Each structure stands twice: as C-alpha cells, then as structure tokens.
Amino acid sequence: MRRQHKTGVFYMKKGKKKQWLIVLVLTVAVIAITCVGGWKHAQKTAFSLTINGTQISKEEYIQCMNLVQYNTMVTLRSEKHDVSEDELWTTTYKNGKTGYEYLAQQTVEQLKYMHAVYDIAKDKGYIKDATYEGMLNRMEQENQSRSEKIEKGETVYGLKEYSTEMYQDYELNYLQETYMNDKSNEDMNFTEEEIQKHYDNDDWFVGEEAREVDLSEARAAVIDELRRAKYEEMTEEKAKVAEVDGDMDALSQFTLKQL
C-alpha cells in the first residue's frame, strides 16, 4: 500500500519496492531473451551466397529459383503423386529433404552452371563482365538499341523488348553457340574417325518424310551434336568444382519465404 505524506509526495513500502524491482528485472530479462532470439533467427534466415567469390544477390537468386521451380515441382510430384499443392514444398521426400530445401539445392546448382557459362565466355573474351549485373547492363543496352530502331522505323527482328528471364535465356544460348562456332577452340574440332563413329551410333533422318541420309548429308548435324555434348561436359565439369560459400539452412528458409 502507498501512503501520502503531507507534502503530497508518495512513498513505497520496502516490501513493495522489492517486488517492483523483481518484476522490472524479469521484464528486462524477457525482452533481452526475445531480442536475442529474434537476432539469432534473423542470422539464421539471413541471405548470403557466393560462387567462386562472386556475391549472388537476392534478385539473381530469385530469378534462378523461378527458372528451376517448375521442373523441381514435376520431380517432387513424380515421387509423391497425392501431395497437395499447399504441402508440396513443406513435405519431406526420399532424400530426407523438404520440397523447399530441394528447390534451394537445385537453384544453387543452376547458378553454378550459369556462372560457369559466363566465366568461360569472359575467359574467351566474348563478354567483359561475367556477373548478373553485367548481364542486366547488356540487356538494358539491347533494349535501348531496339527501342531506338523502332522509333526510327527500322526493322527489329524478334521481341521489341526483352524481359530479364528471356534475355538471360537468349544470352546463355548465344554464348554457347559462339563458343561452339569459334574455330580457335580446339575442343570443338573433331577427327574424321570421331565424326564417323558418332554417325554410326544413330540413324539420321531429314524432312517431314523422315528420309534417312548418309554421312555426307548429315555431317553438319553430326558435328553440331558432338560440339554440344562437348560443351555441356566442359561446362558441367567447371560447375561441379565451383566453390560455394553460404548457409544452406538460411538459403532454404529464404527460399520458403518466396513460395
């Protein structure tokens, strides 16, 4: 109980004061624990990923995640046909991972592959900047060029303007074709024996009537297949040894938040 002095100043009994101090200490402790817990949770879900020393931005990660999301979903559904759409990403599958953990893993693998393509292209001098930001800059320049041509009444083939997804897909294919057709790349040149062997391993047809052709007529297609296979092998090997630095648990939680 509190009593009033003649001066109007309130005093607190010692017992009550002690109880008040205990409550205050407990309150501060609870707040501190909550803050620390929140800080630890923020640390756990913080986004951080580098590939071969290159920092991956959230924008780049999400862009790649969206790219692989459909195929990942098909893979998960092939394992569990009856899983609902709401539970698809939180269900645990045979590999011991949840759907969103598997999606995070697939996203990182795709990022490794794409960075391998860009690193190879930079090493060959096809591009100057192998980063995601470099790709965005090239896209802006391409879109600006197309816009100016349209304003001048000039012919523009293909799209009037690229989206990020479309431009990245176009550029990855372009860089592959550029490497494959670069005569200075010795790994893209094959002996007659290699060409003949690849031709003999399959049947080759052309046209709607599916007319079978000999090597002289199928030669360009045979060499193209050999080059594509060699390029894929080279790129996948480079991606496989890429150094990845990041907390997969945090990446998985970040991935889940995007779904």
Regions found by a protein language model. Give the residues of each.
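Buried hydrophobic packing residues in well-ordered domains
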Residues: 53, 121, 175, 198-199, ...
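Glycine- and small hydrophobic-enriched segments that form the cores of compact globular domains
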Residues: 177-179
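FKBP-type peptidyl-prolyl cis-trans isomerases
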Residues: 19-20, 40-43, 50, 69, ...
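Acidic/polar surface patches and capping/hinge elements
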Residues: 160, 181-213, 227-259
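N-terminal targeting/tethering segments
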Residues: 40-162
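Gram-positive cell-envelope targeting signals
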Residues: 1-64, 100, 104, 222, ...
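Soluble non-cytosolic domains of exported or imported proteins
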Residues: 98-115, 129-133, 161-170, 186-193, ...
